[in-house]
Amino acid sequence: MDVNGDRLRSDIETNATFGAIDAEAGRGRTALTGTPPNRRGREYLVDRLEAAGLAVRVDAVGNVAGRWVPDGVAPDTPAVATGSHLDSVPRGGIFDGPLGVYAALEAVRAVQGSDVEPARPIEVVCFTEEEGQRFAEGLLGSSVAAGEQSVEAALRLADDDGTTLDTALTEIGFRGEGRLDAREWDAWIELHVEQNDRLEAAGVPVGVVTTITGITHCEVVVEGETDHAGATSMADRDDALAAASEFVLDVESAAREATTADDTAVGTVGRLAVEPNATNVVPGRVGMGLDVRSTEYATMNAIVERARASLARITRERDVTTGFERSFDLRPTPMSERCRETPHTACTAVGIEPLAMHSGAAHDTMYVASATDAGLLFAPSRDGASHSPREWTDWADCTAATRVLAETVAALST
C-alpha cells in the first residue's frame, strides 16, 4: 500500500512551526495543552482531517476525532482507531506525538486510495494532555476515553496558576461536548517514536511493542533538624539531605539488582525538594519523587518494598522521621494478541523484519488497552533522544513505519 512520505513530512513540519523554539541543535517546540501553539496545532489538524473527508468531532476534554465511513459501511459499526497526541513537553521535539497523529491520517489516505474495501469506519484520534506538563499526571484524554477518569474530574484539574482544563480548552475553542468512548472501537493502534536507541542499533525501521511497562510513583519525605551549617558539629546533626542521599543510592542498588532477572526494571528518584535549600543551613526536610517501572508487576512491588525497607533503616539509624506514599500506580499493559500479530504480518508484507520490544515510557495506548484491543508501533529515535530538540526520526523511517501502520489499519478494518 502506497503512502505519501512527502505529504506526511509536510504535515509534521507544519505542526513543528506551532510553538517553535530556537535551538542550537535540532528542532524544538513548546505546545502545552490549552496554549495558543496547541490551538494552532489543533486547528491545522481539523483542517487536514476535513480535507481528507473525515467528519470531525471534539469531546468535552478536547479529544479530537476524525471519522471516515467507507461507502456501504453502517456508520455505527465499531471503528478501527489510530492516532496519538499533539501536546509537547517544554522545549520538546517535533516527532513525539505528531508522528502518530499524522501517520494515522496518512494511513487513512492510503486506504482511501487503495483497492481495500474496509468493513469498518476508521478514526484518527488526537488525545488531550498526553504529556501531563500542565494538567495532572498525563495520559489525560485517553484516561477519559477509556472510562478511567470522569469528564467532570478532568475538567476541574488546574495548572500551577489555577487555570482549569475547562477554562483552558474554552479559551482555545476546543471545549467540546460528550465523551469519546474507546469501548466503541473494535481496535486501536498507535505509532510513536521509540525514545530509545534499540531500533537504531538494530537497523530496523519498525518495532512492535509487546508490553508497556507499569509505572509506580511514590512520594517520600525525610525530616531531620534545620541547623546552622557552621555552628552545628557533625555529631549533633540530623541532616535530612544526607539521609535522603542514602535512600537514593539504595533505590539505585535495588533497581540494578532487579535487572539480573528482569532487564526492563528501572528505579529513579527524579525529584528532590530540599528545605530550606540554603548553602549555610543543614537541611531539615527533603521531599522526593520515586519512579519505578517494569513489565513485571512483581518486580515493581519488590523494588518498592526495598525502598520502604531502606527508609525504615534510615529512620532508625539517622534519627529522622520519614513518610512514604505510593501515590500513582499503573500495572504493566500487554498489547492484545491480534494487535501484535497484525502489524507483524504487515511488516513482513512490506519486507521489514520488525523488532519485538517493550515500551519503558507511558503512552495513551495504556489506557485504551483497558477498553479494547490495542497495539503500539515504534519508529527509530536517533541516539535515543526525545523530549528535546535533538529528537529525530529519519523521514525514510517515518514513511516506512507509516506504511506498516496503513497496512495494519487496512487489515484490522476488513
What are these regions (language model features)?
Residues E129-E130, A136-Y297:
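Midchain, well-structured core segments that form catalytic/ion-binding scaffolds
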Residues F18-D22, G162-T210, A242, V248-R256, ...:
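Active-site-adjacent substrate-binding region
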Residues M1-G28:
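N-terminal hydrophobic or amphipathic helices/low-complexity stretches enriched
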Residues T30-T33, T268-N277, G289-D291, T321-R340, ...:
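A short beta-alpha structural unit
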Residues A23-V69:
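A non-catalytic alpha/beta surface segment that caps or lines the substrate-entry region
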Residues L8, I21, V80-G83, P354-V404:
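Zn-dependent metallopeptidase/amidohydrolase metal-coordination segment
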